Each structure stands twice: as C-alpha cells, then as structure tokens.
C-alpha cells in the first residue's frame, strides 16, 4: 500500500499542499479528483520524487519510498512525454529495456500491450503521426510495459472517445487485479465514479474526502427518495417532515427530514395500494464533490 501522511508543499508564501494524507491500496483503483490547481499533479510528483516535499512522509508497505521502489512505479504525466520521431513500438520496447528486460521480452511485452490498447495496426507508425487519443494510449502503454507495482496516471482518459475509455479502463482493472496500487486523476467525474474502488477529493491543497466509493456515498447519502405506485400520490406532501420534489423520472420524488419520515410515506403508500419501487436516491460523485468543496 502507498501511504501519504501529512505531506506539505509550499511555493514561496503559497501552500500548495496542506498536510495531505491518504492511501492507495494494493489491488484497487483510486480516483483522485479536484479542480484545476487543487494539488493533484503536485501530489503525484512528490510521490514520484520529481518534487521534494517540505514535510510529511510517503511510504510503500510501511517503509519510506526509495529510488529502488520508484523503479517499480509506472507514471503517465498529463503532458505528452513520448519522443515524436520514434516509432510507437520501438519507443515502448526502449522503455521496457530501460527496466531491464531483454530485447525479445521487451518486444513481446510491447506488442501485446499495444494490441490490447487498440494500437496493433499503428505500432510501426511514428508517434507524431498518431491522433492525440492514440498518443494517449501509447503513453499508457509506456507506463504499463514493465508491469509496475504502483501505477500513477495523470488524466489518462483525456482526449479518449467512449470506446477507448472502456479499453483503457479494462487494462487498468487488469493491472489492479494483478495486485498493483493504481492512482489516477481525472476531471471526468462520471468516468471516475464508474471505474474506481476508492476516492480522494482534494481542493485548495487539502483533502476534503477520502474512502471507498460506497462508504462515501453512504456518508453523503441524500435525503431524497423516489416512490412508484399505481395509486394517487397527492397526499405525500401533507405528511410531517416531507417535501415533494420535482425531477422524478417515474412516480414521485420527495425529501424526508428523517428516515422515519420516509418510512411513514412507504407505510401509507402500501396501505393505499401496491408499490412497485421505493428507493433512496444515491448521491453521484459530482454531488459529493460539490458538497465537500463548498
């Protein structure tokens, strides 16, 4: 497990990170979200040793992260980092050989990974000849070719179409299933919500929320409920602690001041006739994000 504990970083008088603490668990995908300038890239660069922290600790399996550990890390920066005049597979093979693989093994790994990422027909093209989306896939291959123990990706889904997002997501899930700790940032909250096991939300250099996706949803549970019934529902608004809301796609939606008030609606609805659906509305990641950064 990768663990950050009370990590701080300042640039002059500006505090970029303020006692940042969170964990990236082995075998899990951790989504790292925040607005522009929130501190995501600074945090990642400190983990990778590109930037020095002012204080705090970064540990892997309980020990301080050393240079030897970082050789087992995979990193994809937000900026384009590949050599434009190299062929795609040649580039990935070169990087694999830097990690100690033989030319034969590096070629096998690069070929399999590029094919898995949908670049099988473009692996002999120059990097500069690829579309931005395909360059993004090639950068992901560069981060993955040595099968890293820790994988850190800064905006890996930027510029990808929905099909490419699905392909890349599948590759990341495979890496996590193999035991890697995977941390990725993204502004695409719907993609993060769909893919991640755990979430970290940062704003203004401070962690506003962290934990498993399901735990955060439960912690920030909505007071809104939806009810579908074959009978009239005008009576719902007359019950104590209930406010009828709009926006239900089927039936009626309402806000309940307490769970007991919501259960009173259900009991009354069942007394009046069959109920086909009664559910508490789950907050989206966008809902949670807006709530915690206020």
Question: What residue ranges belong to the model's regions?
Answer:
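ABC transporter nucleotide-binding domains
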Residues: 9-203, 209
């Amino acid at each position: 497990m990768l663990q950050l504990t009370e990590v701080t970083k300042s640039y002059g008088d500006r505090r970029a990170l303020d006692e940042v603490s969170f964990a990236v668990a082995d075998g899990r995908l951790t989504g790292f979200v925040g607005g522009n300038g929130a501190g995501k890239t600074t945090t990642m660069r400190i983990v990778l040793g590109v930037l020095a922290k002012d204080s705090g600790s970064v540990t892997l399996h309980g020990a301080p992260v050393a240079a030897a550990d970082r050789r087992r890390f995979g990193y994809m920066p937000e900026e384009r980092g590949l050599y434009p005049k190299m062929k795609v597979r040649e580039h990935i093979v070169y990087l694999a050989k830097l990690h100690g693989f033989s030319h034969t093994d590096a070629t096998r790994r690069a070929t399999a990974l590029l094919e898995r990422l949908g670049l099988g027909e473009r692996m002999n093209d120059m990097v500069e000849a690829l579309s931005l989306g395909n360059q993004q896939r090639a950068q992901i291959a560069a981060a993955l070719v040595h099968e890293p123990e820790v994988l850190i990706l800064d905006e890996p889904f930027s510029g990808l179409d929905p099909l490419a997002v699905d392909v890349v997501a599948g590759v990341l899930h495979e890496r996590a299933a193999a035991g890697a700790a995977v941390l990725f940032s993204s502004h695409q909250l719907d993609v993060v919500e769909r893919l991640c096991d755990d979430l970290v939300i940062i704003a203004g250099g401070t962690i506003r929320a962290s934990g498993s996706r399901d735990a955060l949803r439960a912690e920030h549970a909505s007071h809104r409920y939806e009810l579908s019934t074959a009978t009239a529902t005008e009576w719902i608004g007359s019950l104590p602690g209930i406010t009828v809301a709009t926006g239900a796609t089927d039936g009626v939606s309402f806000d309940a001041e307490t769970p007991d008030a919501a259960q009173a609606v259900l009991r009354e609805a069942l007394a009046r006739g069959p109920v086909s659906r009664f559910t508490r509305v789950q907050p989206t990641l966008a809902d949670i994000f807006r709530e915690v950064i206020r």
